[in-house]
């Protein structure tokens, strides 16, 4: 077992199978030394977490949803290479399903950000956006990631 997978095990995280896309795109794509991960949704035990921050979900539930999205991002990266090849989590972009009055999207994205820093340490620190939107099918969040890898 490699270093990052060992860390995931220590955290009690098992990477899920990457879902097949439902449209004309792929879960992750490598170009040069970058891997772009398509928006991942929060899935736990095969169940999609749904709801809107400020209506159906509280902040802690939304943070957990973005963490699940980040776990999905790592699973997508692993379809291309070992997670030990990651040299930097460059960027994360979070779409948080929330009411128009809610302003806690950045706080909700901390679930994803804190998770990747916990897994990767300093190389997990990244640039980030967090916006409130109406996510299709009332899914709680969607997180997109860019990672740099070594050969």
Question: Where does each model-flagged region fall?
Answer:
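Short, polar/acidic, helix-capping and beta-turn segments at strand->helix junctions
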Residues: 1-151
């Amino acid at each position: 077992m490699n270093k990052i997978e060992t860390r995931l095990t220590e955290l009690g995280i098992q990477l899920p199978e990457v879902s097949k896309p439902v449209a004309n795109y792929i879960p992750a794509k490598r170009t040069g030394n970058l891997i772009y991960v398509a928006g991942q949704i929060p899935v736990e035990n095969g169940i999609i977490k749904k709801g809107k921050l400020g209506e159906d979900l509280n902040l802690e539930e939304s943070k957990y949803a973005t963490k699940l999205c980040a776990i999905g991002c790592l699973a997508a990266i692993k379809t291309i290479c070992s997670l030990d090849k990651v040299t930097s989590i460059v960027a994360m972009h979070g779409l948080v399903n929330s009411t128009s009055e809610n302003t806690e999207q950045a706080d909700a994205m901390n679930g994803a950000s804190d998770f990747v820093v916990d897994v990767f340490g300093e190389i997990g620190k990244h640039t980030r956006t967090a916006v409130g939107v109406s996510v299709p099918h009332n899914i709680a969040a969607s997180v997109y990631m860019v990672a740099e890898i070594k050969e």
